[in-house]
Regions:
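Solvent-exposed beta-strand/loop surfaces, strongest in extracytoplasmic domains of secreted
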Residues: 26-118, 540-592
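Acidic/polar low-complexity surface segments
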Residues: 2-15, 20, 179-191, 234-242, ...
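Extracellular beta-strand-rich solenoid/capping regions of secreted or surface-exposed proteins
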Residues: 153-170, 178-225, 237-252, 274-278, ...
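Acidic Gly/Asp/Thr-rich repetitive segments characteristic of extracellular carbohydrate-active
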Residues: 119-154
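Structural detector of coil-to-beta-strand junctions
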Residues: 14-17, 158-160, 193-197, 216-218, ...
Length: 592
């Protein structure tokens, strides 16, 4: 014990050899043996691989570490040393450690292997990058993961995918196809099933060029995320129940979904793209298609997100192409809106149902709707206190209370209370509610149903009706191709033009205390005031034109050249005329 022993090639304990005897003790003779423990984790290409070696704490001197085709000499401190190497090739690397020994310890050697990953993810390398569904520790922030080929989850192999740090997810081969075989649980959304998830830790991530099939896409409390040129295809599978197949939710901000294809078919009636309690998010230039039993195609939602009360504000839904199912379904909106100060612009919706409307039970405000085109009969309802302009709507355009709308075209326009509508046209009805202001609008018919409305410079090809509830209506400077019926009281009707080839009245007034003056009215042979059929004596009907038919007769006798000629002009009218006439003879004018 404790001797220094050398014998030829033997040393330390190995140099003590007993030919006979029992119970001999041989230990701690110098130089002693020491194991080399190598500690190295898998590394990311271009990043440092940290290699730690541990010998007996009393070992001194140096050790040689061979890795990546190079040899590095390190000094031992308390029997330990650490080497950081960053220029290692991708794949499996071998690290070998040689210790030359010192006076106390003999030489020894050991080796092990570790991997350097380059971010190429296949169904064979997937579990190198995702440990228990989340990114491995050695995948650094900002890494690029290049997904290649198909990833099918099934009973034997389950590809859980949670992005919990900021990375870039791409497919250079263009064939990344991820099917997590999602089956949603409750319709209330608390069990969305297997998901592709970007959580708060994954904020700052970018995903592009990936196809997700029958897979819940779940962006949860994440920020500054971009989903670009992805496909989310759900076919005949219960995906998105209560949350939407592509769900951006729970306080997420600055998330962008753009240039992507979202297709949903028969998923049990759930929505496609759903933004729930999010702000400053953008859904732009996507193609969104729904077929069969599907829910809303794009939806700003507030349901099924416990623990978050952030309102859906300052989001942008722009330049998307949306096609709804045929036939239309009551549970499917093209775009459903809940929240404030959102921009809905440049979208094209082909659908026979509700194209752009407030979400069920929602009271959104202060949103902007512009440059949207709705075809196929789709309707559009503008939220209260909002702005709508340059929209083309093949169905009914409803302007919410307190809103401002201009330069819109629709099949029919419904103007809610206290809103302002101008410079627009409808091929069918224009309906106006209380306190609304309407100017420079064309339509096939007019119906006013609320009090205190102001309507001017409208052009109506057919009839107009001021209903019994529409008191104190002001109608001025407008044109009608059919009769105007005034059923309510205390209205002002001035400077309008109604010319009817047939009939007994241009205006039928059944309410009282109306002022009907200075209009141009013709109904068959009824002119001016005579073209007003007032059934109530309290109406004021006067100064309506024309006053009557004017017949002018001109006679003159032949005379010799150079002599004066006498020309007789006779004017017949149903009323007394006070204005002057002009007589023109051989291009010379005479005032009579």
């Amino acid at each position: 014990i404790g001797n220094t022993l050398y014998a030829h090639e033997l040393n330390g304990d190995d140099a003590a050899i007993f030919k006979s005897g029992t119970n001999n003790v041989v230990k701690n003779n110098y130089p002693m043996s020491t194991d080399i423990i190598i500690d190295v984790n898998n590394a990311w290409i271009g990043k440092e691989a940290v290699i730690g070696i541990t010998l007996n704490s009393a070992a001194t001197g140096t050790a040689n570490i061979m890795v990546g085709g190079k040899t590095y000499t390190v000094n031992l401190t308390d029997g330990k040393a650490t080497l950081k190497v960053s220029d290692l090739p991708a794949g499996e690397n071998t690290v070998k450690v040689d210790y030359d020994g010192d006076g106390k310890f003999k030489s020894s050697t050991n080796s092990t292997t570790f991997k350097v990953f380059d971010g190429i993810v296949t169904n064979e390398t997937f579990f190198d990058y995702f440990i228990n569904g989340t990114l491995a520790d050695y995948v650094p922030e900002g890494a690029t993961l290049d997904f290649r080929g198909k990833f099918y989850s099934h009973d034997d192999v389950k590809f859980d995918l949670v992005i919990n740090k900021p990375i870039n997810m791409i497919s250079t081969t263009g064939d990344a196809f991820i099917d997590l075989n999602t089956t949603a649980g409750s319709l209330l959304g608390e069990n969305p099933g297997s998901c592709f998830t970007i959580n708060n830790g994954g904020s700052g991530s970018n995903v592009s060029g990936i196809i997700f099939h029958n897979t819940q896409v779940w962006i949860y409390d994440a920020h500054n995320v971009v989903l670009n040129n992805i496909s989310v295809i759900v076919e005949n599978k219960r995906v998105g129940s209560g949350v939407g197949t592509t769900a951006i939710r729970h306080g997420s901000t600055n998330v962008t979904l753009k240039n992507s294809y979202i297709y949903t078919s028969n998923n049990g009636g759930s929505s496609s793209i759903v933004l729930t309690h999010v702000q400053n998010c953008t859904v732009e230039n996507n193609t969104i298609v729904g077929e069969g039993n599907v829910g809303n195609l794009l939806y700003l939602n507030t349901f099924n997100d416990a623990g978050c009360d952030l309102s859906n504000d300052y989001n942008k839904i722009i330049n998307n192409k949306i096609t709804g199912p045929s036939p239309a379904a009551g549970i499917c909106y093209g775009i459903g809106i809940n929240g404030n100060n959102n921009l809905i612009a440049g979208n094209v919706i082909n659908y026979a149902g509700n194209g752009i409307v407030p979400a069920w039970g929602a009271t959104p405000n202060n949103n902007t709707y512009c440059d949207n085109v709705l075809i196929g009969g789709a309707s559009m309802s503008v939220a209260a206190s909002s702005i709508a302009y340059n929209n083309t709507v093949s169905g009914t355009l409803t302007i919410g209370s307190g809103s401002v709308a201009y330069n819109n075209t629709a099949k029919a326009i419904s103007v809610s209370s206290n809103s302002v509508v101008s410079n627009s046209s409808a091929t069918a009805a224009l309906t106006v509610q209380a306190g609304a202001k309407v100017a420079n609008v064309t339509a096939a018919s007019l119906s006013v149903s609320g009090k205190n409305a102001v309507i001017e410079n409208v052009s109506i090809s057919g009839v107009g009706t001021i209903k019994s509830s529409a008191t104190n209506t002001t109608l001025i400077n407008s044109t009608f191709g059919g009769m105007l019926t005034v059923q309510s009281a205390k209205n002002t009707i001035k400077y309008n033009n109604i010319v009817l080839a047939t009939g007994d009245a241009a205006i039928l007034a059944t309410g009282g205390d109306n002022v009907i003056t200075n209009n141009y009215l013709i109904a068959g042979d009824k002119l001016g005031d005579n073209a007003v059929n007032s059934t109530v004596e309290t109406n004021i009907v006067k100064d309506n034109l024309p006053g009557g038919i004017v017949n002018v007769t001109i006679t003159a006798k032949d005379v010799f050249e150079g002599s004066d000629v006498i020309i007789d002009v006779t004017v017949d009218s149903l009323s007394n005329l006070t204005e002057k006439f002009m007589l023109k003879i051989n291009n010379k004018e005479y005032v009579l």
